[in-house]
A protein has these predicted regions:
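Active-site cofactor/cluster-binding pocket
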Residues: 1-185
Length: 185
């Protein structure tokens, strides 16, 4: 698989930095490929802008910067407004329609999956696992990481008392991703 640039963006408290760490480690540790991770967030602990950048490749990554993401996960309108126009035309955008209302910045993107990540997480019992639902969707939609690798990495990073909830969130993401892809074809 060629270089794949992945941008996860939303607001602090949605767990997207952790999501990026989980994804990068899944690829590097369990799929034995190259991965970089970079994060940034506003000065607020929660509620400010947050982004997580992951680059995946089969060869050494010499330029660890994302310019035009192949994959874009947006969990706020601000994220779409700021980064949507940079997504590659043949890329993939995954948006939470409960949080993103205006998709104009994604007009050039051919594959936009509208999946209620936060609502799915809420139905599972805690919206804090929306990031894990998103990782399930991203796994199915992109093939950039194997299911086994993402499952192991999620379990490496979540508290023991939340393992079952996080497993359910990941499975719900796999299912929602598969359904969105089937509906788009």
């Amino acid at each position: 698989m060629a270089r794949c640039e992945i941008l996860l963006s939303g607001f602090g408290g949605q767990g997207l930095v952790l999501g990026g760490i989980i994804l990068a480690e899944a690829v590097a540790v369990y799929d034995d490929r190259q991965a970089t991770h970079k994060q940034s967030y506003g000065p607020e602990a929660r509620g400010g802008a947050s982004k997580s950048e992951v680059i995946v490749d089969d060869v050494e990554i010499s330029f660890p910067e994302i310019r035009n993401p192949d994959v874009f996960l947006a969990m706020t309108q601000e994220a779409v407004n700021k980064y949507g126009k940079n997504v590659k035309e043949n890329g993939i955008a995954i948006i939470d329609p409960g949080l993103v209302f205006d998709e104009k910045a994604l007009a050039g993107v051919k594959r936009v999956y509208r999946i209620p990540l936060t609502e799915i997480a809420r139905e599972l019992g805690n919206e804090i696992v929306a990031n894990i639902v998103a990782l399930g969707v991203l796994t199915v939609a992109t093939g950039v990481v194997t299911r086994e690798a993402i499952e192991k990495s999620v379990l490496d990073h979540v508290p023991a008392k939340t393992i079952e909830l996080n497993k359910a969130a990941l499975d719900a993401g796999f299912k929602a991703g598969a359904e969105a892809i089937a509906a788009a074809q």
